[in-house]
Structures are given as C-alpha cells and as structure tokens.
C-alpha cells in the first residue's frame, strides 16, 4: 500500500511509529485517541500501513503499543485493543493503555485484560502517563508521555512520501533499464541494423531519480545521528523504518544499470550516427554518380560564339550550384567521420575509412570534372572573344581597303600607308593569338574524352574540333585576302605618291624656267668690252641655255610620267593640264630671248673683233691712212648692234 493512496488518513495521525524502542528493542507503536470520533476502519488502514514498514527482523522483536486513552472513552479504548488482536496479534508483545488521571468507572472497566491475555495473544496493562517510564526509557518516549524523543508527524509523512516515490521510481527504472540492457546484450548484432525506438528511452529520467535518491540518502544519514550531548536520538527515519540500506542498495543498482544503459545508449547513438552517416554518404554518392554525372554528360558543347559560350557558362554555374549543396554535405560528413575516427573505436574503423574513402573519391572526381568543364568553357570563351576581336579588326581593315582613296598630298598617303601596316600587323598578332587559343582548346577537347563515363563523345568532339578549325581557317583566309588587298592598295598609294611627286617636280621645273628666264632678262644684258669678254659671255650663255634645256626636258619627262601614272591609277592629274602649257610657254619665251641674246653676243663679238683688227693694223690713226672700206664695215656692224639693242627683249 502506498502512502499517497491513504494520504488523507495518514495526515490524521491516528497512529504513528515515533522511532522509539522498548527495552527489548521492539518498535513503539503509538495510537493517540484524541476523540470519540475515531474511525476504526481508518485506524485499521493506518495500522496495516505502519506495520508494513519495518523489516521482518524488526517485526520479530515485537511491538510495544501505546494506546493513549487519556482523552477518550473506555469503550473506544477497548475496541482498539480488541482490534489489535485482529490486526497484528503475532507482532504485538505489550499494549500499554494510558489511562486518564481520573480513572474510568469500575463498572465500565470491569473487563480484565490480564485475564484475556491468552485469548488476546499479548499483555495489556493500564498505566498512568507519568508511570509509563517504568516500561519504556524516557528517551524513547515522545514529549506527550514525558519523554525526550522528538517526532514531527508531517515531516515523517513527507519523507515517507519521498522514500516511497523514490522506491517506486527506482524499482520501475531498474526493471526498464534491465530490459533495455539485457535486450541490447542479446541482440547487439541486430541492433546495428535498427534505429532507436521508444524501448530505448526509460519512462523517467535516471539522472533525476539518482538525484532524488542521493538527496534522500543524505537526509537519512543526517537524521540518523542528530542527537545532543553525545547521545543518539532515534528518529522515525531510522534505517529500520525507511531501510537506509535499501536506499543505498537501490542507488548502487541504479548506478550500475545506468552506467550500462549509458554505454548502451552510447553504442546505439554511435551506431545510429554511423547509420545516418552511411545513409547520407550513399545519398551524396548516389546523386553525384546519378543526376550530377548525368548533368555533366549532357554538357559537351563549347558554343559557336561569345553569347553561346556565356550561356553554357551560366548553365554550368547552375550545375555547380547544385553540386555545391552536396559538397557542403560532404564536408560535414567528412568532419563527422573524422570525429568518429578520432574516437578510436576499432570495430568501426574499417567501415568508417571505407565510407570516407568512397565519399572522397566520388566528390573529388566530380569536383575535378566540374573544374575541367569550367576551364574548357573559359578557354572557349577566350577563343571566341579573340575570334570576334580579330573579325572586327578584319572588317575594319577591309572597310578601309574598300573605301575610295582621295588623298590630297603625299604626307596623307604616307600616314594612310602607316595606318594600313599597323592594322595588318595587329591582325597578324590577333591571328597568332587565335591559333594559340585554338590549339589550347583543341588540347582540352582531346582530354575531354577521359571524363566521358564510357560515353562515345567522338561526334561531339568532332563538331567542336571542326568548328575551331573552321574558325581559324576562315580567319586565315580573310587575313590573306586583306593582305592581298593591302599589297594592291600599297602599290596604288605608292603610285599616287609618285604622281604627286612628279606633279610637284614638274611645277618646280616651270618655276625654275621662270627663274632662268627672269635671270636672262634682268642680269644677262652685258655684251662685253672686248671680243675676249664677249666670247666668255657667249660661252656662259650656251651653258645657261643647256641648263634651261635640261630643266625643260626634265619637266617634260615628269609630265609624261604623270600621264602614265594617271592612266594606271585611272584618274585625272590635277596639274598636267595647266603645267604643260606653262612649261611650253615659258620655254618658248626663254628660247626666243635666248636666241636674241645669242645674236646680240655674236654681233658684239663681230664688232669687237673687227674693231680690234682695225686698231691692231692701224695703231696710229693720225699718221696712217685708214682703210675706209674696212672702217665702214665696222661702223655698219656697230650701228646694227645699236639698232638691235633698241629692240625690246
């Protein structure tokens, strides 16, 4: 019977075990009859409960029952005494009925207990409260009987409730732990293949029960020796009442079973963790080798333009994003496996290392494939970028070559030629870079077959290779056409430079002739003072005419060259129409002036020669008769020369 069931009755204190003992070490059971309203049924229940507490050894020493009838009537006392016969006749050795100071009427108490000893099974004595110490030591009596033993019924009841709760919970917990531990020992191998279920969890917390037990034991041990003056004061919490050894035994059993339970939980937790890790590892491996690998199997193209390559890169980033989630799980699993490996459980080392190795192999292989694909797409993007830049350069060069050339001077043509050469050099550099990128991309595509998972990628690779080679060949052909056009344009522009040079030089020849004519008119006027000087002037004039003739011939040749160049260039000369008439006009004027100059010099030479001859033959005019005919001839030449000089040049 639990105290909680009859708690309202126990609180009435109809009977109690104070913890005191008689001289035979038997326990003292006190029944305080406080009123005539005492329920015999409730008293019987109380006695049954109290007498179930002591151990069998304690019961064998017998009980001394104190029936306090000082505040009750005799018939109630008699009823209680007779009830003891029915409740515990074998355990009761002595019943002390404490009578009131004013004894009951003899008519009432005519019943003689001593005569009924054989029938009752125990001795009954009537005693005054102050005479009770004759049978029981004072320190074993409570204060209401003049003793020194302290008893707090509610305190005892509360401790009793705690004890019963602990006993009940600990006993139940021990049974549960035993079932769990024994079940684990019998089926440890099968447990590895099962997850934790409700049977592994006790109905109460073992830590809480142990804590309650330790607190209860501490209370018992503290109250076991709480007397004064070196004496021992027995309390209702004595080990014979609440079985302190029983609490200790329960605690020892609990600790043992709980330790085993903790080990079982640790093993099961480790097994569960290992199963979860294995399950997650298989999930990661299954996804990477399944959907993840399938995603990579479908991605073999490199695109045919920058936009196409960028679209493939974006698709690859989406694939990488999905993989990164599983790689994060891999990192977490790897840390968990490392922690379990560091725990040093030999039985799981091989399995853990196998899981770790397989997980690492799959993840690293998949990561390598992702990186390879990313590098391939990056190289493809660079290839298409270089190809596009080169195509734009070729388009610009072609546009420049197809445009009409209308330079105004040679410097502009030289600048244009320099720009063409620079563009052609840039195209050559771009084509070289395209070849390098293309070769690198071809090498990567060749290595791509190693990631094919057994898939025949020859078709995909052939398309990629054909595209790359086609782009490079197309760029080479375009570059060659541009080079040919540059050669033609270079020749044309050089001819234009030559044309401009011829036109400039022809104009310069006209200027030179004008300068020669101007010099002839302004500075070539002396005829000489004698024949010798005139001869010298005549010789200089002939050389002067030769220079003018050379200049005129040079100008004519330049103008003829411009005609040929214009025919070759299919253009009209800017100056040949004006320069040639100017050249001819200046040359004609120069020729007329030159001939006039020659005639004058020749007449002057004839005049000086005849005059000098006359003077040489007739040195003394006063004494010699002159040859008048010769003189007349000289005079005639002189007059003719004077007349010639009066004619404008």
Swiss-Prot record:
Matching SUPFAM superfamilies: CRAL/TRIO domain (SSF52087), Spectrin repeat (SSF46966)
Segments annotated as Spectrin repeats: 272-378, 381-494, 500-602
GO molecular function: phosphatidylinositol-3,4-bisphosphate binding; phosphatidylinositol-3,5-bisphosphate binding; phosphatidylinositol-3-phosphate binding; phosphatidylinositol-4,5-bisphosphate binding; phosphatidylinositol-4-phosphate binding; phosphatidylinositol-5-phosphate binding
Top-rank taxon: Eukaryota
Assigned keywords, A-Z: Repeat
InterPro entries: CRAL-TRIO_dom, CRAL-TRIO_dom_sf, Spectrin_SESTD1
Domain CRAL-TRIO: 1-153
Record-stated family: Belongs to the SOLO family.
Function: May act as the primary docking protein directing membrane turnover and assembly of the transient receptor potential channels trpc4 and trpc5. Binds phospholipids.
Name of the protein this chain belongs to: SEC14 domain and spectrin repeat-containing protein 1-B
Protein species of origin: Xenopus laevis
Classification of source organism: Eukaryota, Metazoa, Chordata, Craniata, Vertebrata
Gene: sestd1-b
